[in-house]
Amino acid sequence: MNADTIHYLNLFLGTGTILLQVFCVVTLFILFFNFKKNKKNVFLDFIDKHFLILVFLISLSATIFPLVYSEIIRFVPCYLCWWQRVFMFPLVLIFGVALWDKDRKVIRYVLPLLCAGFLASVYQNFFYYFGENSNLPCDASGVSCYQHVVSVFGGYISIPMMALTVFFSLLTLLAVAHFYKKEI
């Protein structure tokens, strides 16, 4: 891939990451205030109805794009990125089977994977943005967990931030599917 294609891919994914972050904040805000009033909400109804499709598509995207970066563009993932892949990649299959079977109880199966991936991502983001001098574990290949391979929108969007956003968005959708009550 040439540099322009990589640049536009980074911009596309960076914009998608910011939109997903806005979506999560708005969704949690509506869920919290709807939870207090227990009112029917069209936005939350849509999310609740299409929950399995949404989580499947987000997890599929979160699997495809890291593979594009590592296998096509040839960015070598760091140690913590590998751990996040361990927790993200199986979710595509689990959410795919849940979508096929229309199994909304998938929450209990994926919650441990999502929480572990989210914690690994929070850990990586903390040291990526705030702890340049820490002893963050990096693999023997010399790939640094601090390497700024993708840095879009003034350095705010990076690969670790993309991963954190994906885990957070999946947890947000799980929260809506679990806590949103449709009764008026």
Q: PLM features: residue spans?
A:
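Secretory/periplasmic and organellar redox-cofactor proteins
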Residues: M1-P77, M88-L91, F95, L99-I184
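Cys/His-rich metal-chelating microdomains
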Residues: Q84
